[in-house]
Amino acid sequence: MSFYDEIEIEDMIFDADQGILTYPCPCGDKFQIALDDLKDGEEVAVCPSCSLMIKVIFDPEDLEQFEES
């Protein structure tokens, strides 16, 4: 699997209402991944508008900060 980039979870923006983390994509849209997917061990965020993917770099304990939001 080929990634556009590897992004630290701290650099992503959390939308508490939707439970997703986003990161700007070069196409103008945003890479997205659900917090629940991260909890399940998924680490690939995809852009819904193009074929690019990023790998989210995180430790499981990093997810706790988003549950407190």
Swiss-Prot record:
Gene3D superfamilies listed in its UniProt record: DPH Zinc finger
UniProt keyword Transcription, yes or no: no
Compartments it resides in: Cytoplasm; Nucleus
Cystines in this chain: none
A GO biological-process term: protein histidyl modification to diphthamide
Cofactor(s) needed: Fe(2+)
InterPro entries, per the entry: DPH3/4-like, DPH_MB_dom, DPH_MB_sf
Pfam families, per database record: Zn_ribbon_CSL
Any one Gene Ontology cellular component term annotated for this protein: nucleus
Keyword Nucleus: yes
Metabolic or biological pathway: Protein modification; peptidyl-diphthamide biosynthesis
Binding sites annotated in the UniProt record for Fe cation: 25, 27, 47, 50
Keywords assigned: Cytoplasm, Iron, Metal-binding, Nucleus, Oxidoreductase
SUPFAM superfamilies on file: CSL zinc finger
Ranges where the DPH-type MB domain occurs: 3-59
Enzymatic reactions: [3Fe-4S](1+)-[protein] + Fe(2+)-[Dph3] = [3Fe-4S](0)-[protein] + Fe(3+)-[Dph3]; 2 [3Fe-4S](0)-[protein] + 2 Fe(2+)-[Dph3] + NADH = 2 [4Fe-4S](1+)-[protein] + 2 [Dph3] + NAD(+) + H(+)
Main localization (coarse): cytoplasm
GO MF annotation terms: ferrous iron binding; iron chaperone activity; oxidoreductase activity
Function: Required for the first step of diphthamide biosynthesis, a post-translational modification of histidine which occurs in elongation factor 2. DPH1 and DPH2 transfer a 3-amino-3-carboxypropyl (ACP) group from S-adenosyl-L-methionine (SAM) to a histidine residue, the reaction is assisted by a reduction system comprising KTI11/DPH3 and a NADH-dependent reductase, predominantly CBR1. Acts as an electron donor to reduce the Fe-S cluster in DPH1-DPH2 keeping the [4Fe-4S] clusters in the active and reduced state.
Comment on protein domains: The DPH-type metal-binding (MB) domain can also bind zinc. However, iron is the physiological binding partner as zinc binding impairs the protein electron donor function.
Family: Belongs to the DPH3 family.
Subunit-level organization: Component of the 2-(3-amino-3-carboxypropyl)histidine synthase complex composed of DPH1, DPH2, DPH3 and a NADH-dependent reductase, predominantly CBR1.
Protein name: Diphthamide biosynthesis protein 3
Lineage, uppermost ranks: Eukaryota, Fungi, Dikarya, Ascomycota, Saccharomycotina
Gene of this entry: DPH3
